[in-house]
Each structure stands twice: as C-alpha cells, then as structure tokens.
Design a protein with these regions (language model features):
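Flexible metal-binding regulatory segments at protein termini and peripheral loops
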Residues: 1-101
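Glycine-rich dinucleotide-binding loop and its adjacent helix/turn
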Residues: 86, 140, 233-288, 292, ...
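Glycine-rich flavin
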Residues: 88, 95-98, 114-121, 126-262, ...
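Beta1/beta-strand and adjacent pyrophosphate-binding region of the FAD-binding site
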Residues: 91-108, 262-272
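Short hydrophobic core segments
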Residues: 101-103, 209, 224-234, 268-269, ...
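Flexible, glycine-rich terminal cap/loop adjacent to redox cofactors
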Residues: 103-108, 112, 117-129, 141, ...
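A Rossmann-like FAD-binding core segment of flavoenzymes
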Residues: 166-167, 202-206, 210-218, 285-387, ...
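FAD-site-proximal beta/loop scaffold in flavoenzymes
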Residues: 246-263, 349-425, 509, 513, ...
C-alpha cells in the first residue's frame, strides 16, 4: 500500500459558493490526489489526502492556474486507508470530529451551528433537555402568550369605551395553560426540530456536555473533539437560599407558569422585568399580588420616571408594591408562606399562598469542566468573553445568557452567529452592543434603547431632554389610554439622539425607530422633519423630537 499524507492548504481568493468547486477540480487534475475537502469559500482552506511522493508545488501551481492563491499550511503522514466524511473528520492521524462543536441547543446555539454550516464547516451541536432553550420553552414564548391572555380577560371587564359593554365571564386556567403549552410545542417543532432537519450537516448529540482534562468533550460514554467550541448553555432562574427557603418552596418563573391551580395570593420578590410581567399577569388573572423590591424603586436601571410611573399604574390595578425591602428569611405555616423582612428599619411579615422569586438568572456553567480549559468566569458563573465572543481560551467562544451580555434572545442569536464566524473564518467581527433595544411587557410597556439621562451625563455629554406625555399622542387619545410618556435624551452639541425611553401601551412597537436613529447618528431635528403616519404610537417619537424646540400642546394635528 503506497504511503499517503494529509495536506492542509491555505486558499485565498475565494468569493462565492462556486469557487470551491473550481479549486477542487483543479486539485484533482494533479496526479496523486485522492480526496479534496473544502468546507466552504469563507473557510479559506482545503484538506487533501495525497500520495506521499506528490510534489506540493504542483498542487499550489494548479490552484494558481485556476485563478486563486494557495500555500501549504501543514503536512502529516498517514498510515492505512482513511475515509474522509463530511460528517466527521475524526481520523487515525489525530483529526477532530468537528470543525465546530456547539454546546447548547437554544437560539444562540442554533445561530452558531447554522452560521458554521453556511460557511461550509462540519458542525456538531449538543443539546441537553428540551430542544430550543429558554426562550421557546420556559421564557419569552409561554410568558408573553400568558400576558396576552391575562390582558384580554382583564380588558373585558375594564375597557374605557362607553356603550361597548363586555363581561369577563369565568376564567378557565386549565384551558389557558393548555393553549400556552400547545403554542410552545408548535414553535419548538417549527423553529427548532424542523429547522434542525433542514440542516443535515449539523450532527445533533443529546446529553450533558463536560470538558475533560485532555480538552475533549464527554457526553455520556462518548468523547468528541473539535477545532473550536461555542458554549451556549444559557442560564436558569436564580434562587437565593434565604433561611427557611427549603420549607417555603418558593416558585421561579418556570414553575409558576406550570402551576395546575392558580394561588389566591402571591408575593413576588424582585422588581425588574420578570417580576413585573408575571406579577401583573397573575393579578389580572385574579390573584392577589404583592411585589417586594430590594431597591428603592422598580426597574432601577431605567429612567426614574419610568420606575415611578409603572409603580403607579400597577397600584391602580390593585397590585401592592413595596420598595426598599430587605428579606431576612422565609417560613411556612401550613399552606401559608411568610416573608420576614426589614422595611425602613422596621421588621415586617408578609403572607401569601405562594412566593415567586424573580431575582435574576445564573449562567449554566457548573459541572461543565471549564476549569480544565482555563476558561475565566465572572463571580456569578458567567463566561467572560470579549467583543468577538472569545473566552480566555482562544479555542472556546461563548454567547447568550451563559455570558454577561444583555439577556435578550436576539442578542444571544446575534452573538452565536458572530462567535461561529470568528471561530472558524479567521475574522475579528465584533458583536455591536452599542444600541440594544429592550422591552418589558407590562401594561403599559417599558421600551428603552441607548443612554439614560444620567448615563449620558456620566459619559461627558452636554445633555438635553424632552418628554411628551401620552395625552399629546393622538393614537393614545383615540385608544383612550394615555398612560405614560416618551422621553428622548440628546447631545446638545451635535443634536444627535442618545437614548429613547418609552412607557406606553404597545411602546415596544415604537422603539425600533429610535434604535435605528441612534445607531446611524440621526439628529433629533431629522426625526422632527421625518413624516410619521398619523394615529400611530410611533408618532410620539416625532412629537418628542419636536418638543426639544416647541410646545407641542400649541400645535395642530401633524403640524411641525
């Protein structure tokens, strides 16, 4: 049997999907070439199995003749017959199973795997638990459909239109929960199971992944290796171990939405997105809700006006809100849960049927063996990554909630794509987090992007602001819901928009306009001069831009 060797060529000049075909044909015309594998035109590489006596200059010359440039990157001897496979490159000469192994099968993991496949690389993806990750299974999808169900039932008994008489009727929680579960199943199937089937070059592996001391990944009894790794294992609800927590058996966001029977009363620990969304949802479904927040205001990372405003609106619906609460311990007396706390220097007790802990999330990194890979972690267990999504180990990238990047599914997915490209294509593409819009799906909604007034001042800008109450927005007047406001933050020197902060019904539908304005450096007078359709909520952005210079109360409809 003639001796063989494996060559890896660095190819330059490929610009489209047809280029690898041209190069493969050119290389196979050289005597002694047995197999050619080019992952994709963006990979800039070709792997060959050739006879050992082949002249390497003949290979590079053949590539040059096809209009490209090639250099030999590595050469290694092979003993015996090697069968190359598009699904696995684990070979007797010490090759790897995959070019990229993605750990995690949620939105971030899928984005990384799809990008790597699009680039032409061999991809493995390890999933543990329900495919689809947090968003579709226990996060965005189930919570938002419950929010809409609760809103519909609430509005049936509380809408502001005279003469349009409606009644709430009875609430069938079993049916509400079943419809929620059906939607989760449908979206998991259509957006993950079916999508995976459409990418046959992604090898799906089920099980918990753990790095070993030799740098490989163990899943059950199997060992896998890869050139590069992307960790996208997400996060889970943070459950603080207060004294008495074991007996109190507090709920988290997942277990709350799975309850077979709604409690009569609920204490919510927390005052940010999940706490407010689920707290209001439960209240609108007939549960007596009390929100206890450690900070002195709700949503403390937002503009103070938003925290004050949403507190007032929640209280108007009968939801109790107490801020400045220091929880000391939990206890239980039969079916009653008790929160023992200090409020303004006084010891107090709060009682309810159930307690919901909505106190943030913790990264899923425990038990992964990352200590074997010298991967640096934050104190909360999150993987430290740079703007290219690369960890302290140059072969390992991470994205999504397992990092300390903003916990939004769209940030996770964007990071997955960036991580895969940088890991495999020798690029340095940063994940742009300069303009990340966020929406809290309370009613009214909280929608923000860019800098708050305080943040802008801290960064050294000469700041100017404008605020328009929803009573000046025609859409809100027609809908008879003028709760809230729109606040814009701008640089007085350049007139560029720096931040937008909305508290309004369906405010999330208006925030993307502000996002684009900030991203592309649009000035507030450009916003003011732009045509906005009348009787839309987003027209409020135009009015807020005009309000920097004029009193909009003195303008007619659509006037500028």
């Amino acid at each position: 049997m003639a001796p063989k060797k494996k060559l890896e060529l660095d190819i330059r000049g490929m610009t489209c999907d047809r280029c690898p075909q041209h190069i493969e044909r050119a290389l196979k015309q050289v005597a002694g070439v047995e197999t050619v594998e080019i992952p994709g035109w963006r990979s800039n590489k070709a792997t060959l199995i050739v006879k050992s006596d082949i002249a390497e200059r003949d290979l590079t010359a053949s590539v040059e003749g096809a209009g490209y440039h090639a250099t030999v990157k590595s050469s290694s001897a092979i003993d015996g017959e090697i069968e190359q496979s598009a699904q696995s490159s684990f070979t007797e000469d010490g090759g790897h199973d995959f070019d990229l192994l993605v750990i995690g099968a949620g939105s971030a993991g899928f984005a990384a795997a799809i990008k790597a496949t699009d680039l032409g690389f061999r991809v493995g993806m390890i999933g543990y638990g329900a495919i689809g990750g947090t968003c579709v299974n226990v996060g965005c999808v189930p919570s938002k459909t419950l929010i809409r169900a609760a809103e519909a039932w609430h509005n049936a008994g509380h809408h502001p239109f005279k003469g349009a008489n409606t009644q709430q009727g009875n609430l069938d929680w079993d049916l509400v929960r079943t419809q929620k579960d059906d939607l989760v199943s449908q979206m998991r199937q259509s957006k993950y199971v079916n999508v995976l089937a459409a990418y046959p070059k992604i090898t799906y592996i089920e099980g918990a992944a753990q790095f070993t001391k030799d740098g490989s990944v163990r899943v059950g009894e199997r060992i896998y290796t890869a050139d590069r790794y992307v960790i996208a294992t997400g996060a889970h609800p943070r459950m603080i171990d207060f004294p008495g927590s074991e007996k109190a058996e507090a709920l988290n966001s997942t277990t709350l939405m799975e309850l077979e029977q709604l409690p009569k009363s609920l204490i919510v620990l927390g005052g940010r997105a999940v706490a407010l969304e689920l707290g209001q949802t439960m209240a609108r479904l007939g549960v007596d809700v009390l929100i206890l927040q450690r900070s002195t205001r709700l949503v403390p990372d937002h503009e103070p006006e938003i925290g004050r405003g949403i507190k007032d609106y929640l209280e108007q619906e009968g939801i109790g809100v107490i801020t400045g609460v220091e929880v000391k311990r939990l206890s239980r007396d039969g079916d009653t849960r008790i929160v023992h706390a200090r409020v303004l220097g006084q010891e107090r007790e709060f009682k309810a049927d159930q307690i919901l802990m909505a106190l943030g999330r913790e990264a899923n990194t425990k038990g992964m063996g990352l200590e074997h890979m010298d991967v640096k972690l934050e104190q909360n267990g999150a993987i430290v990554v740079d703007k290219y999504m690369q960890s302290s180990n140059p072969t390992i990238y991470a994205t999504g909630d397992v990092t300390n990047n903003p916990e939004f599914v769209y940030v996770a997915a964007a990071g997955g794509s960036v991580a895969a490209q940088n890991a495999l294509a020798d690029t340095k593409k940063p994940l742009d987090l300069s303009t990340v819009p966020g929406v809290i799906f309370t009613d009214p909604q909280i929608a923000t992007v860019g800098l708050t007034e305080a943040q802008a001042k801290n960064e050294g800008y000469r700041v100017k602001t404008s605020t328009v109450g929803l009573e000046h927005v025609a859409r809100a007047q027609a809908a008879r819901d003028t709760r809230g406001f729109i606040k814009l933050v701008a640089d007085e020197t350049t007139n560029r928009l720096l931040g937008a902060h909305i508290l309004a019904a369906e405010g999330g539908e208006a925030i993307q306009t502000a996002t684009l304005a900030i991203k592309y450096g649009i000035k507030v007078d450009d916003l003011a001069d732009t045509l906005f359709p009348y009787l839309t909520q987003v027209e409020g952005l135009k009015l807020a831009a005009i309000a920097f210079e004029k009193d909009i109360a003195m303008l007619s409809c659509c006037a500028a």
